């Protein structure tokens, strides 16, 4: 697309970054100044009843800056990148029609990628094929199915852990239905995003600072009642660790503690480590992201001013 045709498209802002980088605080500040409406881009914030461990904006923050696509699923329900793209496009169209600018804020990079580039045309789920895969897993174990995936799609197998039955079964299901691997199909992008996008990423200048922020926030969550929040989910009886909601960072480790698999101290240690690993993956993804403007978490006023400098011209 030419620069001229891009300039005629409606505007949108991406505010990306690792966990605990200060994205929400910056987004709220920007909403005070720019004609923006916020859309959450976070695969954990979609779940109802999962507030403390996901660092969901609190009531005061949401009053100052309402976020769309929060609390739209029960933790027992699935939500895909395709679901997100559909919902986000609808929200963006609604915001644009009202003469305002969509500000998409979050750390789920797969969602940002799906929105920006479109999605490959993957086959729909097939209950019969899925049942056959699960039967084979019950008889032979998921390790056996992972070896099977390695034979047909080594790239996907390297990315998917043998203990991730949901993604493993989906990769095999796609192959059995279409005869093509998940890797082949995902190399074919769908429709690109019909917006002129200003992209920002916010993070601390050093890894050590980010690690400090992560550890501090995890302890803040514990002090705010994170254990009680997960106990309420645990007590429902219909949730388990195969669900994406319970595999969220922090929740998975607290679940193991509640099941008696690990001690409280081990839960804290693993929770902090898992959050650091998540942040590392997010930063790695962003380092390879084209056209992104980096902001420093430790200089929030400067970060705000840099965004305003880049997008200020679209505020009118």
UniProtKB/Swiss-Prot annotation:
<keyword id="KW-0460">Magnesium</keyword>
<protein>
    <recommendedName>
        <fullName>tRNA dimethylallyltransferase</fullName>
        <ecNumber>2.5.1.75</ecNumber>
    </recommendedName>
</protein>
<dbReference type="GO" id="GO:0005524">
    <property type="term" value="F:ATP binding"/>
</dbReference>
<keyword id="KW-0808">Transferase</keyword>
<keyword id="KW-0067">ATP-binding</keyword>
<feature type="region of interest" description="Interaction with substrate tRNA">
    <location>
        <begin position="166"/>
        <end position="170"/>
    </location>
</feature>
<feature type="region of interest" description="Interaction with isopentenylpyrophosphate transferase">
    <location>
        <begin position="206"/>
        <end position="229"/>
    </location>
</feature>
<comment type="subunit">
    <text>Monomer. Binds to tRNA(Phe).</text>
</comment>
<dbReference type="InterPro" id="IPR027417">
    <property type="entry name" value="P-loop_NTPase"/>
</dbReference>
<feature type="binding site">
    <location>
        <begin position="19"/>
        <end position="24"/>
    </location>
    <ligand>
        <name>substrate</name>
    </ligand>
</feature>
<comment type="similarity">
    <text>Belongs to the IPP transferase family.</text>
</comment>
<keyword id="KW-0547">Nucleotide-binding</keyword>
<dbReference type="InterPro" id="IPR039657">
    <property type="entry name" value="Dimethylallyltransferase"/>
</dbReference>
<feature type="site" description="Interaction with substrate tRNA">
    <location>
        <position position="108"/>
    </location>
</feature>
<comment type="function">
    <text>Catalyzes the transfer of a dimethylallyl group onto the adenine at position 37 in tRNAs that read codons beginning with uridine, leading to the formation of N6-(dimethylallyl)adenosine (i(6)A).</text>
</comment>
<dbReference type="GO" id="GO:0006400">
    <property type="term" value="P:tRNA modification"/>
</dbReference>
<feature type="region of interest" description="Interaction with substrate tRNA">
    <location>
        <begin position="42"/>
        <end position="45"/>
    </location>
</feature>
<feature type="site" description="Required for specificity towards tRNA substrates containing a purine at position 29">
    <location>
        <position position="280"/>
    </location>
</feature>
<feature type="binding site">
    <location>
        <begin position="17"/>
        <end position="24"/>
    </location>
    <ligand>
        <name>ATP</name>
    </ligand>
</feature>
<feature type="site" description="Interaction with substrate tRNA">
    <location>
        <position position="130"/>
    </location>
</feature>
<keyword id="KW-0819">tRNA processing</keyword>
<feature type="region of interest" description="Interaction with substrate tRNA">
    <location>
        <begin position="247"/>
        <end position="252"/>
    </location>
</feature>
<dbReference type="InterPro" id="IPR018022">
    <property type="entry name" value="IPT"/>
</dbReference>
<dbReference type="Pfam" id="PF01715">
    <property type="entry name" value="IPPT"/>
</dbReference>
<feature type="region of interest" description="Interaction with substrate tRNA">
    <location>
        <begin position="120"/>
        <end position="124"/>
    </location>
</feature>
<dbReference type="GO" id="GO:1990497">
    <property type="term" value="P:regulation of cytoplasmic translation in response to stress"/>
</dbReference>
<feature type="region of interest" description="Interaction with substrate tRNA">
    <location>
        <begin position="280"/>
        <end position="287"/>
    </location>
</feature>
<dbReference type="GO" id="GO:0052381">
    <property type="term" value="F:tRNA dimethylallyltransferase activity"/>
</dbReference>
<dbReference type="GO" id="GO:0034605">
    <property type="term" value="P:cellular response to heat"/>
</dbReference>
């Amino acid at each position: 697309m030419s620069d001229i045709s891009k300039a005629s498209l409606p505007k949108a802002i991406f505010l990306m970054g690792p966990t605990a980088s200060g994205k929400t605080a910056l987004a709220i500040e920007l909403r005070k100044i720019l004609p923006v409406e916020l859309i959450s881009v976070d695969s954990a914030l979609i779940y109802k009843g999962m507030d403390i461990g996901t660092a969901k904006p609190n009531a005061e923050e949401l009053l100052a800056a309402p976020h769309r696509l929060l609390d739209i699923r029960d933790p027992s329900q699935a939500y895909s990148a395709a679901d997100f793209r559909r919902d986000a496009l609808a929200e963006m169209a609604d915001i644009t029609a009202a003469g305002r600018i969509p500000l998409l804020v979050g750390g789920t990079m797969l969602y940002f990628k799906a929105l920006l580039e479109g999605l490959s045309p993957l086959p729909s789920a097939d209950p019969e094929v899925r049942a056959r895969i699960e039967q084979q897993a019950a008889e032979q174990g998921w390790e056996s199915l992972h070896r099977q995936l390695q034979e047909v799609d080594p790239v996907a197998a390297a990315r998917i852990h043998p203990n991730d039955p949901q993604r493993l079964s989906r990769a095999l299901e796609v192959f059995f239905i279409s005869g093509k691997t998940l890797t082949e199909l995902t190399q074919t992008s769908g429709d690109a995003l019909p917006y002129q996008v200003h992209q920002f990423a916010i993070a601390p200048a050093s890894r050590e600072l980010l690690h400090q922020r992560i550890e501090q926030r995890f302890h803040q969550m514990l002090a705010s009642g994170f254990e009680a929040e997960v106990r309420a989910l645990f007590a429902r009886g219909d949730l388990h660790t195969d669900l994406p909601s319970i595999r969220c960072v922090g929740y998975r480790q607290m679940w193991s503690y509640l099941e008696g698999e690990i001690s409280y101290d081990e839960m804290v240690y693993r929770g902090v480590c898992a959050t650091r690993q998540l942040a590392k993956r997010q930063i790695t993804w962003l380092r390879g992201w084209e056209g992104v403007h980096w902001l420093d978490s430790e200089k929030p006023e400067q970060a705000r001013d840099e965004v305003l400098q880049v997008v200020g011209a679209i505020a009118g």
